[in-house]
UniProtKB/Swiss-Prot annotation:
GO terms for molecular function: electron transfer activity; heme binding; iron ion binding. The gene is cccB. Induction: Induced during exponential growth. Repressed by glucose. Gene3D superfamilies: Cytochrome c-like domain. It comes from Bacillus subtilis (strain 168). Residues 1-20 form the signal peptide. This is Cytochrome c-551. Binds 1 heme c group covalently per subunit. Present in very low amounts in the cell. SUPFAM superfamilies: Cytochrome c (SSF46626).
Length: 112
């Protein structure tokens, strides 16, 4: 009986130890407040540099994609966001997620 209790105690102790040492891979949930105005210009520019610069150029001058230097004078923020999300011409859809598309669109809409 004593050996069974010892085995149970060791098993329990190991379980507790493993649980305490386990990694916490839980991802933080992003809370979307629904406000696109909270995005700063630097966030929009940073996302552009990460995802768009290859086709539209460092200074929005256009490379294989069109020039975007005055895109805000041609399209409003919602149209720009729609193009980013759904693609157009040679630009495929889904290059960025919806939240990133909104941030980039807000930033680009100010380019007039």
């Amino acid at each position: 009986m004593k050996s069974k209790l010892s085995i149970l105690m060791i098993g329990f102790a190991l379980s507790v130890l493993l649980a305490a040492c386990g990694s916490n891979d839980a991802k933080e949930e992003k809370t979307d407040t629904g406000s696109k105005t909270e995005a700063t210009a630097s966030e929009g520019e940073e996302l552009y540099q990460q995802s768009c610069v290859g086709c539209h150029g460092k200074d929005l001058e256009g490379v294989s994609g069109p020039n975007l230097q005055e895109v805000g004078g041609k399209y409003d923020e919602h149209k720009i966001e729609s193009i980013i999300k759904n693609g157009r011409g040679n630009m495929p859809k889904g290059l960025v997620d919806d939240n990133e598309a909104a941030v980039i669109a807000k930033w680009l809409s100010e380019k007039k």
